[in-house]
């Protein structure tokens, strides 16, 4: 299952539709807190916005890595200044909004293939 975390309901809907049309099971969460309450055990991949109230995407990624270090995490942002920060550097799954849907799907497929191959 692919979890999508974003405080923008339009992005949640469009991203969910995109993933489901590509054959993935997607669950949408409007905040990091709602994802954490639901639990991480069912997840195969996490896509999270960076700029959210409360726990932001960087903090969520760090929390997830403590309990599920093997879980692929993709960060997305519409704020280009965030994309240029040091915290975003070296993140393999990093996308700026608006992102290319096919590039995102290819990156998801690649990340899931790597995780099923054990690395």
Regions found by a protein language model. Name each.
Residues 9-27:
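Two-component/phosphorelay signaling modules centered on CheY-like receiver
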Residues 28-45:
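Acidic, metal-coordinating helix/loop segments flanking the phosphotransfer/catalytic sites
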Residues 39-42, 63-70, 89:
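Conserved phosphotransfer cores of two-component systems
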Residues 49:
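Active-site residues of response regulator receiver
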Residues 52:
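Receiver (REC) domain active-site loop signature in two-component systems and cognate sites
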Residues 74-76:
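Hydrophobic/aromatic residues positioned on beta-strands within the core alpha/beta folds
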Residues 99-111, 116:
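C-terminal output helix
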């Amino acid at each position: 299952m692919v979890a999508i975390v974003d405080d923008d309901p339009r992005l949640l809907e469009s991203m969910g539709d995109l993933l489901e049309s590509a054959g993935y099971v997607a669950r949408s969460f409007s905040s990091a807190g709602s994802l954490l309450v639901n639990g991480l055990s069912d997840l195969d991949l996490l896509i999270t916005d960076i700029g959210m109230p409360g726990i932001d995407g960087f903090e969520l990624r760090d929390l997830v890595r403590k309990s599920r270090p093997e879980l692929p995490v993709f960060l997305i942002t519409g704020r280009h200044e965030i994309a240029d920060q040091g915290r975003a550097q070296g993140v393999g799954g990093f996308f700026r909004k608006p992102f290319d849907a096919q590039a995102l799907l290819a990156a998801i497929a690649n990340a899931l293939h790597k995780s099923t191959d054990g690395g």
